[in-house]
């Protein structure tokens, strides 16, 4: 399948679907967190400045993560390419680490509860993930392995005419849609939000597990392939660390609950 990677053009300026996915994701996160928070975690003044922290943290984290995790040798030889964001190359795990560091600094600076802020993010971020994976699908990148199932698709970027798993759609559904339903159902219909850090743990563990298993039907990145036992990809390794981080959030939540009794 072939879909134009450019959503629309304004004169010589090309607006790509992947760029729009980041824009839509951040706008939604800002609007949605403000809607469900109702100034309980973030105050009015902090909302006016937090968006710039999100944008910078996501872009820097995503780019640095991609460089370090997926294509370090290339960027060592061609360092100027690091600045060419329009050529692609972003890592979700890197963006997550980036935004967590950025939000930690922002929250400490503004005397905001860090875990409570992370929990709000756990409710909104899945929508950004959904948009990002749909953009990957439109771009025909991050496609799956060859398959004979009926929903298999041809991705010209693979260099062949074989039917492959639409792994981008699997991820959009599992990491995006389902994760949004889960975190928000817990937020609105249970008391889990009173245990600060638990929603963050659900986010990390669910995403890590879903990503780990979907990677088995996703074609590994050509520049690094498999990194452990000719079976485990970089995405899976990073997802394992994400799961571990999720259990660490559970520990933090329990510690905070103990001292708040």
Curated annotation (Swiss-Prot):
Endpoints of the signal sequence: none
Transmembrane among keywords: yes
Places the protein is found: Cell inner membrane
Membrane topology: Multi-pass membrane protein
Keyword tags: Cell inner membrane, Cell membrane, Membrane, Transferase, Transmembrane, Transmembrane helix
Pfam families xrefs: LGT
The keyword Translocase appears for this protein: no
Annotated a 1,2-diacyl-sn-glycero-3-phospho-(1'-sn-glycerol) binding sites: 133
GO biological process: lipoprotein biosynthetic process
Chief location category: membrane
Pathway(s) this gene product operates in, as recorded in its UniProt entry: Protein modification; lipoprotein biosynthesis (diacylglyceryl transfer)
E.C. designation(s): 2.5.1.145
InterPro entries (UniProt xref): Lgt
Transmembrane portions of the chain: 13-33, 50-70, 86-106, 112-132, 169-189, 197-217, 232-252
GO CC aspect terms: plasma membrane
Function, in words: Catalyzes the transfer of the diacylglyceryl group from phosphatidylglycerol to the sulfhydryl group of the N-terminal cysteine of a prolipoprotein, the first step in the formation of mature lipoproteins.
Family per record: Belongs to the Lgt family.
Descriptive protein name: Phosphatidylglycerol--prolipoprotein diacylglyceryl transferase
Origin species: Ehrlichia canis (strain Jake)
């Amino acid at each position: 399948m072939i879909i134009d990677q450019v959503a629309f053009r304004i004169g010589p300026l090309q607006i790509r679907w992947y760029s729009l996915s980041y824009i839509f994701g951040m706008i939604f996160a800002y609007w949605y967190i403000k809607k469900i928070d109702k100034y309980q975690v973030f105050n009015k003044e902090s909302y006016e400045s937090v968006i710039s922290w999100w944008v910078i943290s996501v872009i820097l984290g995503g780019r640095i993560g991609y460089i370090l995790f997926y294509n370090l040798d290339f960027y060592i030889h061609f360092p100027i390419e690091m600045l060419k964001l329009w050529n692609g190359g972003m890592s979700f795990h890197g963006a997550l680490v980036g935004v967590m560091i950025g939000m930690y600094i922002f929250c400490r600076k503004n005397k905001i509860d860090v875990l409570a802020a992370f929990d709000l993010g756990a409710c909104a971020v899945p929508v950004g993930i959904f948009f990002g994976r749909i953009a990957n699908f439109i771009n025909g990148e991050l496609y799956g392995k060859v398959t004979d199932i009926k929903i298999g698709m041809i991705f010209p970027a693979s260099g062949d005419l074989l039917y492959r798993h639409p792994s981008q759609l699997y991820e959009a559904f599992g990491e995006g849609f389902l994760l949004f339903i889960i975190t928000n159902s817990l937020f609105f219909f249970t008391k889990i939000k009173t245990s600060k850090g638990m929603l963050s743990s659900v986010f990390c563990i669910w995403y890590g597990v879903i990503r780990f298993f979907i990677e088995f039907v996703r074609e590994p990145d050509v520049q690094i392939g498999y990194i452990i036992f000719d079976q485990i990809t970089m995405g899976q390794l990073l997802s394992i660390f994400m799961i571990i981080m999720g259990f660490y959030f559970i520990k933090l939540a329990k510690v905070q609950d103990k001292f708040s009794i």
